[in-house]
Amino acid sequence: MATSPQKSPSVPKSPTPKSPPSRKKDDSFLGKLGGTLARRKKAKEVSELQEEGMNAINLPLSPIPFELDPEDTMLEENEVRTMVDPNSRSDPKLQELMKVLIDWINDVLVGERIIVKDLAEDLYDGQVLQKLFEKLESEKLNVAEVTQSEIAQKQKLQTVLEKINETLKLPPRSIKWNVDSVHAKSLVAILHLLVALSQYFRAPIRLPDHVSIQVVVVQKREGILQSRQIQEEITGNTEALSGRHERDAFDTLFDHAPDKLNVVKKTLITFVNKHLNKLNLEVTELETQFADGVYLVLLMGLLEGYFVPLHSFFLTPDSFEQKVLNVSFAFELMQDGGLEKPKPRPEDIVNCDLKSTLRVLYNLFTKYRNVE
């Protein structure tokens, strides 16, 4: 039982001026009223704080704010399933990311007569992922071409994903996809996978920065479906990841002066042909003809006045890896010649990134333009 607080012993006080009786009565009333209001305000604040605390606990598992697909309601007790908030799908940046990735896949697989229209629906069974990886890596995978049953599809998907993970060499916590999530058509998992592939192989595309998806995590508790929402980041600063985050004169040319860009291209074509013509070679397309690294290696030998042994590089590279090795070797020759390490990555050149190729060739032009 609560007890009333005991009164404190009286303490002598200093004399105070006497107030008129009516004013004292008013002060007493207002004091009581003020104390009551203060207590009520404090009680309200405590109540609101308690409610806020309860909401913080309960809201993450609140009733689902939208209608679920019938398949997504078939959960066992305590089973958890994730899905994209339908409202998040209309985000312009997410739409842009999906379009860029779809266009990239279709460009890579143009010779396979494969047209992707929907990432989740077209990639879940592993068929397109297999073809995409084979094309990017120039390696044939030992898997069945056509699979109909779910078991066969998952077996194929397992093989494809294992090979992809082996190539990407990502730490386990960075791998945000698996057989079950991809086969379940998880857009989040498939996007993470495609972004990782495009960045590893230095795809000649520009991914939008800071794309996030609102993900709804659904769980069945005591027979009731409850949910919580989390923000899943798909892309961060893609410029920094690609190694092209520092703007230079070529960024300005591409963005604001296409006419001057054409002049630069013609100047560089004239420069490289002046030397490559000595080997009866000629360049007309800068972005494509330097992509395998062969012309870069030969050009460095001509500029520095030495013969590059043919066993030092791949004269007819037939895989992405061999092309990257060629370009890397050419970069080493440039550094041996006194140039700084090129800012672009070898993969950028192999993927026909024009801006990266121009940067490398312009550095050569600056140093060797007077070489006959």
Swiss-Prot record:
CDD domains: CH_PARVA_rpt1, CH_PARVA_rpt2. It is found in: Cell junction, Focal adhesion; Cell membrane; Cytoplasm, Cytoskeleton; Cytoplasm, Myofibril, Sarcomere, Z line. Coiled coil: none annotated. Residues 1-45 are annotated as: Disordered. Residues 1-11 have a biased composition (Low complexity). GO terms for biological process: actin cytoskeleton organization; actin-mediated cell contraction; cilium assembly; establishment or maintenance of cell polarity; establishment or maintenance of cell polarity regulating cell shape; heterotypic cell-cell adhesion; outflow tract septum morphogenesis; protein stabilization. Residues 95-202, 262-369 form the Calponin-homology (CH) domain. Widely expressed, with highest levels in heart, skeletal muscle, kidney and liver. InterPro entries: CH_dom, CH_dom_sf, Parvin. SUPFAM superfamilies: Calponin-homology domain, CH-domain. Pfam families: CH. Changing residue 4 to D: Loss of interaction with TESK1, however no effect on interaction with ILK. GO terms for molecular function: actin binding; cadherin binding; protein kinase inhibitor activity. One of its GO terms (cellular component) is cytoplasm. Component of the heterotrimeric IPP (ILK-PINCH-PARVIN) complex composed of ILK, LIMS1/PINCH and PARVA; the complex binds to F-actin via the C-terminal tail of LIMS1 and the N-terminal region of PARVA, promoting F-actin filament bundling. Formation of the IPP complex is dependent on protein kinase C and precedes integrin-mediated cell adhesion and spreading. Interacts with TGFB1I1. Interacts with ARHGAP31. Interacts with the actin cytoskeleton. Interacts (via C-terminus) with TESK1 (via C-terminus); the interaction inhibits TESK1 kinase activity. Interacts with PXN/PAXILLIN (via LD motif 4). PANTHER family: ALPHA-PARVIN, PARVIN. Belongs to the parvin family. This is Alpha-parvin. The lineage of its organism: Eukaryota, Metazoa, Chordata, Craniata, Vertebrata.
